[in-house]
C-alpha cells in the first residue's frame, strides 16, 4: 500500500474523455512530474488528487483510505499551490505567511521569504509586487509547511532561473526527507533523471 493511490480514474469534460483507467501508486520520497499536451488534463488531475474535484469514475486513496473518508487528516498533510497564487493581495508578504502559518514565528517567516528570494520585500503589500514576486510569496510556504504531500501546478511560472534552482533544491530536500512532491511544469527540471518519476497523461490513462 502506497501513501497516495489513484485507482482507475476517469475524467470527462464537455463530452470529451481527458483520461480513463488512470492508476498509479506513490510512496514516501517520490518526486513526480505529470506530463501531457495542452488540454490533456494535467491541472484537472491535480485537482482530483487534492480532493477539490471528483472523478467521473474511480477513486483517490490516502494511506489506503478513500479521500472523502479521511478528508480532514488528508488536508492537514497536503500543501496545494495552484495556478493562482492564492494570496491576500492587500496584506504584505510577511502578513500572508503569518496568515497561512499561524504557528510560525516572525523569524521563521522572514527566513522563508529570504529563501524564496524576497528579502527586502517583506513589508510591501502584495498588490505592489510583480507577478513573479507574488508567486514567490505563495511558494515561500514550502519553507514553512509541515505537510507531507506537496501538489504544485506550474510552480515555476514567472520565476527566474535562480529562483527555479532554489525551489528545485527545496523539493529535492523534501523528498529526501520522505515527503512527496507532485508537480506540473513546462520547464526542464535540473535534476537527475533517476530522481524524477514521470506520469504522462493519455486518453487511455498513464503511459
Swiss-Prot record:
SMART domains: AAA. GO terms for biological process: cytochrome complex assembly. One of its GO terms (molecular function) is ATP hydrolysis activity. It is a peripheral membrane protein. Residues 4-207 form the ABC transporter domain. It is found in: Cell inner membrane. Its EC number is 7.6.2.5. Keywords: ATP-binding, Cell inner membrane, Cell membrane, Cytochrome c-type biogenesis, Membrane, Nucleotide-binding, Translocase, Transport. PROSITE patterns: ABC_TRANSPORTER_1, ABC_TRANSPORTER_2, CCMA. It catalyses: heme b(in) + ATP + H2O = heme b(out) + ADP + phosphate + H(+). ATP binds at residues 36-43. InterPro entries: AAA+_ATPase, ABC_transporter-like_ATP-bd, ABC_transporter-like_CS, ABC_transptr_haem_export_CcmA, P-loop_NTPase. One of its GO terms (cellular component) is plasma membrane. It is an enzyme of class 7 (translocase). The complex is composed of two ATP-binding proteins (CcmA) and two transmembrane proteins (CcmB). Part of the ABC transporter complex CcmAB involved in the biogenesis of c-type cytochromes; once thought to export heme, this seems not to be the case, but its exact role is uncertain. Responsible for energy coupling to the transport system. This is Cytochrome c biogenesis ATP-binding export protein CcmA.
Amino acid at each position: 500500500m502506497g501513501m497516495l493511490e489513484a485507482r482507475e480514474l476517469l475524467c470527462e469534460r464537455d463530452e470529451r474523455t481527458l483520461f480513463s483507467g488512470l492508476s498509479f501508486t506513490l510512496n514516501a520520497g517520490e518526486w513526480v512530474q505529470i506530463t501531457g499536451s495542452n488540454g490533456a488534463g494535467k491541472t484537472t488531475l491535480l485537482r482530483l488528487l487534492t480532493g477539490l474535484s471528483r472523478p467521473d469514475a474511480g477513486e483517490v486513496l490516502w494511506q489506503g483510505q478513500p479521500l472523502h473518508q479521511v478528508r480532514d487528516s488528508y488536508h492537514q498533510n497536503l500543501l496545494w499551490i495552484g495556478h493562482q497564487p492564492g494570496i491576500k493581495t492587500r496584506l504584505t508578504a510577511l502578513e500572508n505567511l503569518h496568515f497561512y502559518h499561524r504557528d510560525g514565528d516572525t523569524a521563521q517567516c522572514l527566513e522563508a521569504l529570504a529563501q524564496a528570494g524576497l528579502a527586502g520585500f517583506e513589508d510591501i503589500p502584495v498588490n505592489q509586487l510583480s507577478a513573479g514576486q507574488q508567486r514567490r510569496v505563495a511558494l515561500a510556504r514550502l519553507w514553512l509547511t509541515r505537510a507531507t504531500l506537496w501538489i504544485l501546478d506550474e510552480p515555476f511560472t514567472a520565476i527566474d532561473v535562480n529562483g527555479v534552482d532554489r525551489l528545485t533544491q527545496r523539493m529535492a530536500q523534501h523528498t529526501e526527507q520522505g515527503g512527496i512532491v507532485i508537480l506540473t511544469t513546462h520547464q526542464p527540471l535540473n535534476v537527475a533523471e533517476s530522481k524524477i518519476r514521470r506520469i504522462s497523461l493519455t486518453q487511455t490513462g498513464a503511459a
